[in-house]
Amino acid sequence: MKNNKNAFTLQGETAPFRVTREQMEKVNELHVLGIVAAEVRLKQTGEINHLIGDVGENEREFQKRYGELKRISKQTPIGISGLQQSFDEFLLTDGEAKVLYQVDRQGEPIFGKQAKYTSPGNPFYPVRIQTTLHKELQQKAEEVIEANEIKKGGLVLLDVKTNEILAMASKPSLQVRDENLYKTTLENQMLTPHFPGSVFKTVVAAAVIDQKVNLFNRTFNCNKDLYGENDPQVRMGTLNFKESFARSCNRTFSELGNELLQKDKTVLETYVAALGANEKVGWKGSVFHTPHFEQMPEEKGTTIWGNEENKNSKKAVEQTAIGQKDVRISPLAIANMMATIARNGEKMEVKAVEKIVYKNGADFFTFESHTLNGKQLSYETVKTLQELLRGVVTREKGTGTAFRSLPLSVAGKSGTAQTGKGTRVNRWFAGYFPYENPRYALVVVDLETDSKVNKVTPIFKDMVGAIYQLENEK
């Protein structure tokens, strides 16, 4: 310490010493010259949560964002991803903190004199961001994703009533120690659109029901592929609409997709929006001087069509109707779709942050719940959709029969999407629970996997089990 002319952070072996607020107060009560325990914002090391994000020093970016703030050092760490980035202007330190003490003419401290700690002195700043994450469920999410060796993918868990994110885990983990891996692992896969596969049949089903397509006594030849030309991978025989949804028959939905598009070229866009899964679904609105603030600006919106011409191509429509071709939806948007269905069609924006809190604990800004505008599904349509999603689990040969034994009743939809990358597929299960009184919406996805092992099912089951256990402990 004696050889350091400027204030510095005392390091352990790999990182600064972390202390509790109580320990911080005790250290400062000792009045040891030159040693002060204080709150600082530091760049993290190792693996970090994508939603929370990372901070780092970037003079050029600092100048771009805060060039007019002359009192703050350009070396001040700023948010470069996740909530750290979107809430950076609130989290930025209000000036520099320093340790002041008397020195001799050589600049050496005069020991025995009192050291003085100065900071901007504002009891209100820096503010804290209170996220919606549930500590135990977030830890469980990270554990099960890790234990099941998901290389790319993750999960999103929403509170159905509030539409808040309770847990979000994304792989590959953000690697901050390796510069080469850092850029390739920066993307939060839960906010990035991917091929949804058969999960998208939920949208087609909503349109079919709401448009009152005549399904009475109608059956579909599920011994044919989606084009009605060749044998599919699995011959299912002749199925009605409800059986087709439960067993995920491609031919049924490609046929119905074409019928819908012949009547209305924007039908799929209409029902993706009605289910709360179009564009960006994260919280956005006015926050003080920022009229268009987004909690999750890294979120990317849904794509259904690559170009308008494809709407006139029978095969392109058939591929689109089963969540292939150009369809891309983020896991967050799919989770929002399931939460919308669970709430009987009420559409809401998704929150990751509940409020901003002053340093002294008082509320600074509360993020009120926002509804999503536009068409809303009728009560009758939603009730039928709910029954279809429950049938995936309860019907004989449904693709979700593995969830029957869970302590909470599940409704949902599976999906396996081709990715165009050889044998690699996206494997999904999206649903909500308990079915009778929905409280949670959960999406699990294993992206671009060539593994023959279904890792999605055990992860979904583990999360439901953990929630049941947590609720019963209370």
How does the language model describe each region?
Residues 1, 83, 341, 459-467:
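Short amphipathic C-terminal alpha-helix that caps PH/PH-like domains
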